[in-house]
């Protein structure tokens, strides 16, 4: 047995695999010395016995048993035969889950190019060969020959393209009796491309390119730099350009491309099985044609069909006609499974479903503090259930977990009190997809609310790029003390006032907040109710408005706490409009926006002309600053 691999690693690097590496992935030597791993038959399962066909796409000898601890022929059953390889069928007695990671391979009768490197943007194959993509395609798909060695012919050059007619003409000249031509070699298909790539000396080409770059400029220089960058990457990773042409293709584990039986006895299968079957059929047919020395034109056509089959397997529809299945639906290739929103990376690896998380619509919570969020009770009891159960048992309200769950389902009032205690000081993380920057996920202190919607402070919306037209957000509960501390110290919404990208404030009032501020402080000459009334303090003015004694925009006089307080107005307010002397000798000076009472030239009280709306606005800001 192989020693257990150390699972610790720093990073994963994706690169080109050599034919030997691909073979290693799928090849295994059985204890009896038999080497298995090559898939040679297109069959999947036997429709009578419903067992996988040997050497086929679901072969138990290559990929492992379909049933736990049971070989294909049934000679060995049960776990006591663990590790034995059946002498009759050659299947190792082990768990069936090995079929999720054991791979196979198909040895191709002729090399084929990898469609990603040929038809990708940019085309690395054409950049490396310093040829036009159209020309490389002509060679790969058997539409043109390429000169591999011009020999002593003066009218031929290395990598020159030739049509069928041109090559026949040159061939006639070579085989003529009086011909002095020799050493001419031409090729066609992926084999010719493989030969050209094998003949490349990367270090030498890189040196030549560096010299040329120093002497050139403009578009030519940019093209040379592009080619040099690709060559340098090949040198740095230790990959060979010839590996872009495939001699062996891997067959992914059968449980990742399953075949399941439906109720009516029919089978549903992964599209990959159809694509692999096409490759194997064409590969076997090509091998047979080569064996019987079939005419070149037939062999060449079969090689082209094999190239197209491998292209469809790797990336269906990238080049040529898309391969379709039943109902004219395009078959899903390996690329389709990996890429996009529903692909393996974004759907299954990055987008895993996790415990202790919930999701709901967001609504505005204007009464919340910026670092708070409203969490529906129904969601909170589910998210914090383990914590609530633990606390219920510790408080002695229940004796075991089962009783605690019953109490929670019943909705006992004591449960809500315990939940309040549990969530106090326990931050939760709110995330809105797509999380485009680090402020897309922030921590908040949960406040229990009625209803089924998460309440969010309107000021944090710009960071999440959220609005309240049906947006949804996910809630996550940090479990460990370290994650809770990190959430509180680094991720709490009140610590994320500035954008990390620009350094400018990302928390700024907008829309209805700006409208509300404007409405509170605006003027409205039609608001006359309570106009000209005097109030001794802010609270009296606010209460008068709340009881409907004055309008929000009516001008009233409010006593200032500091008689010498400077009142800021749009226009200078220094001109005394009227002076009034009282019986006690004090003087009241009437200004446009204030009234000041003075005794012996010293101000003893001051009334400011304002509106209840402006008083409320000022009071709210003062209260917020005082609390902070």
From Swiss-Prot:
GO BP terms in the entry: DNA-templated transcription
GO cellular component terms listed in the entry, alphabetical order: DNA-directed RNA polymerase complex
Pfam families recorded: RNA_pol_Rpb1_1 (PF04997), RNA_pol_Rpb1_2 (PF00623), RNA_pol_Rpb1_3 (PF04983)
Record SMART domains: RPOLA_N
Residues that bind Zn(2+): 71, 73, 86, 89
Swiss-Prot/TrEMBL keywords: DNA-directed RNA polymerase, Magnesium, Metal-binding, Nucleotidyltransferase, Transcription, Transferase, Zinc
CC cofactor: Mg(2+); Zn(2+)
Cofactor mode of binding and number, as noted: Binds 1 Mg(2+) ion per subunit. Binds 1 Zn(2+) ion per subunit.
Enzyme Commission number, as recorded: 2.7.7.6
Binding site for Mg(2+): 467, 469, 471
Assembly description: In cyanobacteria the RNAP catalytic core is composed of 2 alpha, 1 beta, 1 beta', 1 gamma and 1 omega subunit. When a sigma factor is associated with the core the holoenzyme is formed, which can initiate transcription.
Stated name of the protein: DNA-directed RNA polymerase subunit gamma
Organism (species): Crocosphaera subtropica (strain ATCC 51142 / BH68)
